[in-house]
Amino acid sequence: MKKKVLSVLLVAAMAMSMLTGCGSKPAGNDAQSAASSEASKETEAAAETPASAEDETLTVWCWDPNFNVYAMKQAEKAYQVDHPNFKLDIQEKVYSDIETALITAAEAGDYSTLPDIFLMQDYSFHKNATNYPGIFTALDDCGIDFSQFSMGKLADSTVDGTHYGIPFDNGATIMAIRSDMVEAAGLKVEDFKDTTWSEFMELSKKVMAATDVPMLTCSGGSEIVIEMLQSAGASPMVDGKVSLVDNKALKKAIETYKQLIDEGIMADYTDWDQYIASMNKGTAAGVIQGCWIMSSIQAAEDQAGKWAIVNMPKLDDVEGATNYANCGGASWAVSSNCKNTDLAFDFLNATFGADVDLYDDLLVNAGAIASYLPAAQSETYNEGNEFYGGQAVYKDIVEFAGHVPGIDYGAYYSDIRSALTDAITNVVQKNADIDTEIKNAQDTVEFNIAE
């Protein structure tokens, strides 16, 4: 895929020099006068420099040099245009090490080891903000217009109405489908847009008859069930209590998943490499996943022009159901140890909270799709992508993100997902009763919470 930068960040390199006095040594009675003059110059120089370079340095923890670290380096350059003394000390750490350091600091009651800014997985915010609130600086007064981000993404880092994260990468759910396989069945890509799951299944059967491959591939049933749940805006936690039993959307999602498997419409792989291979080798006609899966799809260069992106199907007969969900991603947080919150707020506001040019650069050079909604209006985001038949896929994905409902997992996302994985496995492999398995899942989560 050809990549074209349509906007360039112009970074002005500014340096400050200090006069150190290189003239000849003053003689006799002129020495005191010269010393006084030199002291005066130093005082004036200090007065002209309101803050040292060190005072304008922020420390950042994040992972992945080609993605998150790159994003911070580009944000630093962008901010330096108007703030030449500004610097970032970016420390690359794997996420597990970041979370361990955060929890260790919180349990010791000593936050002095924390950086000014850190990146956190979205699904970790509720858990950490609930259990270790002292880690964070609240962002409600940081100046960022949070309405310009996806509501579904914001919900992950908003706890009890308080914002703790600034959304970064986009995890909007997409349905990527093989346009050539769809056309072989006498259908069009447009037929798969804005469908219900029952409509999707009928279309899929036609594609399967024409191609002899499953319509979808997946890896781990709980993920797609959770995406279905979010697409209906149905929270698994309500008012701090587990809400799996009598959750109509959840039951419908599990029923839908079972039907997809039973009718051979979707193949479920436990091995991740086999899952990716099913896309790259053409043994499945599509996939529903967070938009980050696109890099894996695009690894099969021989399939360029044979893929398209549409939104996911919505649950039938569920009030509030939509065609949109989110899967994965991370957001920037400011720690309670931040030495200069005004500077951190201004930096984040001016870059990740407003800079469309920055988001253009990150898309082209790092493959980072914005969750900042105005980014979809740029020329870069509206440019057709040859791999997807000339479709302006990035604009579409940001627009998808703008429709994602927010739901509440509380501090127990991992517990809920684990319990649902067991429930779904029993329903599909043992034909277990769905209501019973949902009740067992709720009991399991409640037991874990009570411990």
Feature-to-residue mapping (PLM):
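Extracytoplasmic ligand-binding clamshell segments of periplasmic binding protein
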Residues: S96-T100, G233-K306, V310-L315, D342, ...
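Short, low-complexity disordered leader/linker segments with a strong preference
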Residues: M1-T59, V81, T436-K439, D443-E451
